[in-house]
A protein has these predicted regions:
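Basic, flexible linker segments flanking DNA-binding modules
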Residues: 5-9, 44-138, 230, 288-292
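Short, charged amphipathic recognition helices of the HTH superfamily
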Residues: 14-34, 80-94
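K/E-rich alpha-helical interaction surfaces of small helical-bundle regulatory domains
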Residues: 30-53, 82, 262-281
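Mobile genetic element proteins and their domesticated derivatives, centered on retroelements
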Residues: 32-33, 43, 74, 89, ...
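Short hydrophobic alpha-helix segments
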Residues: 169-170
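RNase H-like two-metal-ion nuclease catalytic core shared by retroviral integrases
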Residues: 200-202, 208-215, 222-245, 255-264, ...
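C-terminal domain-tail junction helix/linker
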Residues: 218, 242-332
Length: 332
């Protein structure tokens, strides 16, 4: 209801609704108003005008309002002097005899035309980014804590952004910048032709100069996510959550070797068997190797075959019922 007039009948209906249910339920009117989503000041203003039509005069032109030609002149003058601020622009127009307006009116006209904040850039936080279209374009890397027998260890994983395939992983008692380099290099050795963009958070291992040099020497690029914004690396954050909820906590590893065994089995299941909702309920291995079109086509074929089978079965059942009905009628 913000920015527009509320019709009187709607306004009075809201008043009647609040009064009626406040009496029936003994819930305060203030709470009902809050649930409805109306400010208390607006509600009590409506109640004071109950039964009367709207008498707003906000859209009646005032004598001091700028005329259309004046607004057009301000916009045209701004286009001729785009680097000037609105205050300087105002007095330049005043001295040049273009229009006689105040700085506030100049600001309103330029703001309504969307001509202010010429150097401002909208934040891209929360808008996402261009998703990879093929495997090995993006590799997400992150480090997470794993509780093993009451001791916390470091788990570092690399996840392919397109297929969600776990490229490589390792558990260590410490996870320095050098350890991360070893894990990334092991992943590169599995896929020698890959030159992905490495996406990470701003952990100390990833902002180190040696890690930057390693990425550059390997022919890859590196992108760090926005600080205090883990959603921008949400793919691998979600992987670590799945690992903990589906593998670590139910499996309860007793020591480091036991944890490696359990995680190895789970990752084999995750990569090759488990259907991933973000990629059309495919196994990451199938997506990685480009088998998704054949799988989708086979699924559609099976669904269509089942529909046709059910259709033919119902037709046969109806025909059989029709024959039985005809025979029964002939006997009678």
């Amino acid at each position: 209801m913000k920015g527009e007039w509320t019709p009187p009948d709607v306004r009075d209906t809201v008043i009647d609704f609040v009064n009626e249910w406040s009496d029936k339920t003994e819930i305060s009117a203030a709470r009902l108003i809050r649930w409805i989503g109306i400010r208390q000041g607006k509600f009590y203003d409506w109640r004071a005008r109950y039964g009367r039509v709207n008498e707003h005069n906000g859209w009646i032109p005032r004598d001091w309002w700028l005329e259309d030609w004046e607004k057009e002149a301000i916009i045209a003058f701004h286009a001729a002097h785009p680097l000037e601020g609105y205050r300087r622009l105002c007095f330049m127009m005043l001295d040049a005899g273009v229009v006689a307006v105040s700085p506030t009116s100049t600001w309103r006209v330029l703001h309504a035309a969307g001509l202010l904040r010429r150097f401002g850039k909208a934040s891209k936080k929360g808008t996402g980014f261009v998703q990879p279209l093929a495997p090995h374009e993006h590799w997400h890397v992150d480090i997470s804590y794993i509780n093993i027998g009451g001791t916390f260890y470091y788990l570092c994983s690399l996840l392919d952004g397109c297929s969600r395939y776990i490229v490589h992983w390792d558990i260590r008692e410490a996870m320095t910048e050098g350890d991360v380099e070893i894990i990334v290099q092991a992943a590169r050795e599995k896929f020698p032709g890959a030159a992905p963009r490495i996406i990470s958070d701003n952990g100390p291992q990833f902002i180190a100069r040696d890690f930057k040099d390693f990425i550059r020497i390997c022919g890859m690029t590196h992108v760090r996510t926005s600080p205090f914004y883990p959603q921008s690396n949400g793919k691998i954050e979600r992987w670590h959550k799945s690992l903990k909820t589906e593998c670590i906590r139910p499996g309860t590893p007793l020591n480091l070797d036991d944890a490696r065994r359990i995680i190895t089995g789970y990752i084999a299941h995750y990569n090759n068997v488990r259907l991933h909702s973000a990629i059309g309920y495919l196994a990451p291995k199938d997506k990685l190797e480009g088998r998704e079109k054949g799988i989708f086509a086979e699924r559609d074929r099976r669904i269509e075959e089942a529909r046709q089978r059910r259709k033919l079965a119902r037709q046969a059942e109806r025909e059989e019922q029709a024959v039985d009905t005809a025979l029964l009628a002939a006997v009678n």
